[in-house]
Amino acid sequence: MLTPAELVWLIAAVAKGDEAAFERLYAATRAKLFGVVLRILRRQDLAEEVIQEAYVKIWNSAGQFNPALASPITWMASIARNRAIDVVRKKSESSIEE
């Protein structure tokens, strides 16, 4: 795992559209974020989809990251966790409607 300072630097580079920085960020954080998502969803197939969506959001939102408000991994885990919770809510809503 990279240091928080390195993660901050990578997120700043991602905000500028640096694909190599994004690949490095992904490689360094995927296992942790996948674990967060898998604990919520308990299904590997759904977790794979959610983690992809989370990284798209991380790519699109990197410019909004503020290291004064949260650590990089906390910010990224929040994005992944919130996306997983959205999926759980959607699944429970659809099962209620059925």
Regions found by a protein language model. Give the residues of each.
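Short, charged helix-capping/linker segments at alpha-helix termini
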Residues: 1-2, 15-24, 34-53
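Acidic, Ser/Thr- and Pro/Gly-rich low-complexity regulatory segments
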Residues: 3-9
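Hydrophobic side chains within well-formed alpha-helices
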Residues: 10, 21-22, 72
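Structural recognition of an alpha-helix C-terminal capping motif at a helix-to-coil junction
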Residues: 35, 49-56, 70-82
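Short, basic/polar amphipathic helix motif occurring as a linker/hinge flanking DNA-binding modules
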Residues: 87-98
